């Protein structure tokens, strides 16, 4: 069977209040966005590019041998940005799968980027994402930790039913920390960005709920660990420490 063509896109912009200029902050000798680019390249699943509205970010990526595409500054979400980027980079629509990798995941494992493709082996799945089991009460209670609620459909696989910032589901049993890494079928991404924001999306401030409310199927692959995002100065120091040892 022919392997599908895959386009990995990393949306990046400067609008961080807690870490100004976040994509260009140095981590182990490279701008953070270039560290994320390296992890995507190491996954070796397809073409990789950074989608940005900021010339300084594009220049940094290109200076380190990467590919960047400029997008409009007024996109409401990363998904809209990667859709515009996919249309510019692949106007013929040859890429069947588009991966959305957050630009603040410099320590993500390349294997996790490969893992997010696995649920799409089922043709009924529109969008694939990842989650890891929650092991601490602090993580369980934190609204900043998005919980993935799903029905088990196989070993280390869930069919997504809901995503929430609340502690859910109630009662005994595992709960899962959602990881913001997505693999879209090209047609699913096009449909997703054409939809208006949905009521639950606006209430929870979670754009993936737009897809669920529209009847799209999201499957979740279970992985062992959550990649460390960089949102605060302590996060930045942790990433620097981890990658300085790599």
Swiss-Prot record:
Record's keyword annotation contains Nucleotidyltransferase: yes
Biological processes per GO annotation: CMP-keto-3-deoxy-D-manno-octulosonic acid biosynthetic process; lipopolysaccharide biosynthetic process
Stated family: Belongs to the KdsB family.
PANTHER family reported for this sequence: 3-DEOXY-MANNO-OCTULOSONATE CYTIDYLYLTRANSFERASE (PTHR42866), 3-DEOXY-MANNO-OCTULOSONATE CYTIDYLYLTRANSFERASE, MITOCHONDRIAL (PTHR42866:SF2)
CDD domains in the record: CMP-KDO-Synthetase
Protein name in the entry: 3-deoxy-manno-octulosonate cytidylyltransferase
Main EC class the enzyme belongs to: transferase
EC numbers, comma separated: 2.7.7.38
GO molecular function, one term: 3-deoxy-manno-octulosonate cytidylyltransferase activity
Pathway it works in: Nucleotide-sugar biosynthesis; CMP-3-deoxy-D-manno-octulosonate biosynthesis; CMP-3-deoxy-D-manno-octulosonate from 3-deoxy-D-manno-octulosonate and CTP: step 1/1; Bacterial outer membrane biogenesis; lipopolysaccharide biosynthesis
Pfam families: CTP_transf_3
Main location group: cytoplasm
GO cellular component: cytosol
Summary of the function given for this chain in its UniProt record: Activates KDO (a required 8-carbon sugar) for incorporation into bacterial lipopolysaccharide in Gram-negative bacteria.
UniProt keyword list: Cytoplasm, Lipopolysaccharide biosynthesis, Nucleotidyltransferase, Transferase
């Amino acid at each position: 069977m022919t392997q599908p063509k895959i386009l990995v896109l990393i949306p990046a912009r400067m609008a961080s209040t807690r870490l100004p200029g976040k994509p260009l902050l140095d981590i182990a000798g490279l701008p953070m966005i270039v560290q994320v680019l390296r992890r995507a390249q190491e996954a070796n699943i397809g073409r990789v590019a950074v989608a940005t509205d900021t010339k300084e970010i594009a220049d940094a990526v290109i200076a380190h041998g990467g590919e960047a595409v400029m997008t409009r500054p007024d996109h409401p979400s990363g998904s809209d940005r990667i859709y515009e980027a996919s249309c510019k980079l692949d106007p013929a629509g040859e890429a069947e799968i588009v991966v959305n990798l957050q630009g603040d995941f410099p320590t993500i494992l390349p294997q996790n980027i490969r893992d997010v493709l696995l649920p799409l082996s089922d043709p009924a799945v529109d969008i694939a994402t990842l989650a890891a089991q929650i092991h601490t009460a602090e993580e369980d209670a934190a609204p900043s930790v998005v919980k993935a609620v799903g029905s088990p459909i196989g070993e280390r696989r869930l069919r997504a039913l809901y995503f929430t910032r609340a502690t859910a589901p109630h009662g005994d049993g595992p709960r899962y920390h959602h990881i913001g890494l997505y693999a879209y079928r090209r047609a699913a991404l096009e449909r997703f960005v054409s939809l208006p924001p949905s009521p639950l999306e606006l209430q929870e401030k979670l754009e993936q709920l737009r897809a669920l409310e529209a009847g799209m199927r999201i499957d979740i692959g279970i992985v062992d660990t959550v990649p460390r995002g960089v949102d605060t100065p302590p996060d930045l120091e942790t990433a620097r420490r981890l990658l300085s040892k790599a």
